[in-house]
């Protein structure tokens, strides 16, 4: 697959809370695997109808293989409605089984840390990270 971005090492994830994993995940620990990072918001219609179901399907199709799907709940609007408690209910309701992290709030409260590090412009966003930890599609 031809890269759609200049070769760049993927920035580490800044996560305040994890769901569907017993321990926090780091990209460093996932080196050697292909990582699909799915950034979403619970109240994003495109995330609910397309992005998140696609991420779950990838996770189910390739679990145990050399591909890991990681969800990143990145809240840049409607902050009061998108709490970790609400996210936990969302994960249960939609039967999501892939690991999901809550992106750390940004300094000014608008753009979350990981979203800013990756230059994401909205949700849903998918980032593909190769086995060497390099972003190969954004």
For the regions a protein language model found, what residue spans apply to each?
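Hydrophobic/aromatic beta-strand patches that form the interior of the parallel beta-sheet core
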Residues: 37, 70-72, 101, 127
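N-terminal "domain-start" segment that seeds a small globular fold
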Residues: 1-28
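Loop/turn elements at helix/coil->beta-strand transitions in domains of secreted/extracellular proteins
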Residues: 32-35, 65-68, 95-99, 131
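Thiol/disulfide oxidoreductase modules built on the thioredoxin-like
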Residues: 94-96, 102-138
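Short active-site neighborhood of thiol/selenol oxidoreductases, capturing the structured segment around
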Residues: 25-51, 55, 69
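Structural microenvironment flanking redox-active thiols in thiol-disulfide oxidoreductases
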Residues: 49-94, 105-112
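Proline-centered helix-kink/hinge sites
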Residues: 11, 45-46, 53, 99, ...
